[in-house]
Swiss-Prot record:
Name of the protein: Ribosomal RNA small subunit methyltransferase H
Catalytic activity: cytidine(1402) in 16S rRNA + S-adenosyl-L-methionine = N(4)-methylcytidine(1402) in 16S rRNA + S-adenosyl-L-homocysteine + H(+)
Major enzyme class: transferase
Localization of this protein: Cytoplasm
Source organism of the structure: Shewanella halifaxensis (strain HAW-EB4)
Gene3D superfamilies attached to this UniProt entry: Putative methyltransferase TM0872, insert domain, Vaccinia Virus protein VP39
Lineage: Bacteria, Pseudomonadati, Pseudomonadota, Gammaproteobacteria, Alteromonadales
PANTHER family in UniProt: 12S RRNA N4-METHYLCYTIDINE METHYLTRANSFERASE, S-ADENOSYL-METHYLTRANSFERASE MRAW
Length: 315
């Protein structure tokens, strides 16, 4: 029997509003999760609209059964980093009216101890988004070099004590391998001296391992670039980030593609030619959840929504 976990989509109204839904438009939900954003998009689409959802989590694919009778909807089992490939296979490159990306780990993934994402619930050290393939967190921790662990913790978790934690993990695994989330979380809590207020000492390390195991930042980079190639002129991009690494990537991506190509000083190039190379324009300011939403859903606290619009292609 499958245990059900509630999931509240973050910034739901704002994110879908950012897509500026056309009744007959074609949209991508690159991170289906449990279908909250997809449901909202479908509510706003007309009978001739279309929604293509993507997710690499087999449990998310199973959850998509809720829309099996809706002919406007289809689900693709795969990573959002490959969204451009999926769209090209469907013959829809340059015809997508909006792309929605939500980089958060869903509540069902966090709440299901068997998935191994949470340091608050004891379970196997897995952390794979697609638990049918790839190495688990336990397998990586069992053989990673101290230098590699320290680099992952610092780069993907912005963990200040990365080297100390890596050394302690290496020392402890000599006695017994880390197989459970609680074993790793307890070790980090035990060796961390300067604890951050209202934050579990293992937060950054768990985030770092999850990002590394799932190649999340590479997937994000590919998804953003892919969205640029599939969007129709005036198509919208709505992106929700949950930590500073993700948000910096999104912010820089929008800024870079809004400014156009950088030209070496002195080159005879007109403003019109520079404008032609601009591919996006930001829409409004970054949006954060209201106090009311955070009260309803504490996991929304760190979320940030950024919206951009595709400019016409170069002539």
């Amino acid at each position: 029997m499958t245990q059900e976990f509630e999931h509240l989509s973050v910034l739901l109204t704002e994110t879908v509003a950012g897509l500026n839904i056309k009744p007959d438009g074609i949209y991508i939900d690159g991170t289906f999760g449990r279908g909250g954003h997809s449901r909202k998009v479908l509510e706003e689409l007309g009978p001739n609209g279309r929604l293509i959802a993507i997710d690499r989590d087999p449990q998310a694919i199973a959850a998509a059964e809720q829309f099996k009778d809706d002919s406007r909807f289809q689900i693709v089992h795969g990573g959002f980093g490959q969204l451009a490939d999926y769209v090209e296979d469907l013959g829809l490159k340059g015809k997508i009216d909006g792309v929605l990306l939500d980089f958060g780990v869903s509540s069902p993934q966090l709440d299901d101890a068997e998935r191994g994402f949470s340091f608050l619930r004891d379970g196997p050290l897995d952390m794979r988004m697609d638990n049918s393939q790839g190495q688990t967190a336990a397998q990586w921790l069992a053989r990673a070099e101290i230098e590699d662990m320290a680099w992952v913790f610092k780069t993907y978790g912005e963990e200040k004590n990365s080297r100390h934690i890596a050394r302690c993990i290496a020392a402890d695994r000599e006695k017994a391998p880390f197989l459970r989330t609680k074993e790793l979380a307890d070790l980090i809590a035990r060796i961390t001296k300067n604890k951050e207020r209202n934050k579990h000492p293992a937060t950054r390390v768990f985030q770092a391992i999850r990002i590394y195991i799932n190649s999340e930042l590479e997937q994000i980079d590919q998804a953003l670039e892919g969205a640029l190639t599939v969007l129709a002129p005036e198509g919208r991009l709505s992106v929700i980030s949950f930590h500073s690494l993700e948000d910096r990537m999104v912010k820089r991506f929008i800024r870079r593609n809004s400014q156009g190509e950088s030209v070496p000083h002195g080159l005879p190039i007109t403003e019109e030619e520079i404008n032609k190379s601009r591919k996006l324009k930001g829409v409004g300011k970054a949006i954060k959840p209201s106090a009311e939403e955070i009260e309803r859903n504490a996991r929304a606290r760190s979320s940030v929504l950024r919206i951009a619009q595709r400019l016409p292609y170069e002539a």
